[in-house]
Amino acid sequence: AKRFADAPSVYFIPQIPQEGKWYRWWQRSKQWAFEKLLRQWLLSASADPNRLYVFGISEGGYGSQRLASFYADYWAAAGPMAGGEPLKNAPIENLRNTPFSLLTGALDEGFYRNKLTAYTKAALEQTKFVYRVELLPGYGHHIDYSLTTPWLAQYKRNPTPLHISWEDFEMDGRYRRGFSNLVVLERPDTQ
């Protein structure tokens, strides 16, 4: 906290959850815990709902990329590092109003992180969204993590965007009830 002079910003930094098979952030129990944490923070007197950020490293990079897309309407900006999710798990469409930074080492081939980061960059290049996606030359899984938060802190959430894109994707069989100012009144029967 002493490193950054951007109060009253709040950063949510997912790491490997300590419960559940495979320790993943997309599991329902983690979603419920995360939503409760967000609600409690938003009720605090010091909360600035337009200065809420998410970033993570490695497993936290996967988690923060999925959470960035699933809860894009909450974040001022998002910054996964040393991660890289398949786009079906973290659709870029939801990032229209959420500045997004993804930094991965160009030599980080574990779990195809460098390839998945390149796919994310190629998809975002087709948009006019605010983003920074880079494969850092000469780096493997351990990159310079200090580059992300100063970039994120430049941005504040726009609570009333003129345009919204929302791919209503599921995480662990669960969908959001709404997104931004949209609400789902009825879902089609998919059985």
PLM region spans:
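The feature captures the conserved acid-bearing segment of alpha/beta-hydrolase catalytic domains
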Residues: 77, 82-153
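Sec-exported extracytoplasmic/periplasmic mature domains
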Residues: 6, 39-46, 69-73, 125-129, ...
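Surface-exposed acidic, glycine-flexible loop patches that form ligand/cofactor-binding
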Residues: 2-4, 41-48, 88-94
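Stable alpha-helical elements in mature extracytoplasmic
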Residues: 30-37, 59-67, 71-74, 116-120, ...
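Alpha/beta-hydrolase-fold serine-hydrolase catalytic core, especially in secreted/extracellular enzymes
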Residues: 125-191
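Active-site machinery of serine-nucleophile hydrolases
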Residues: 1-43
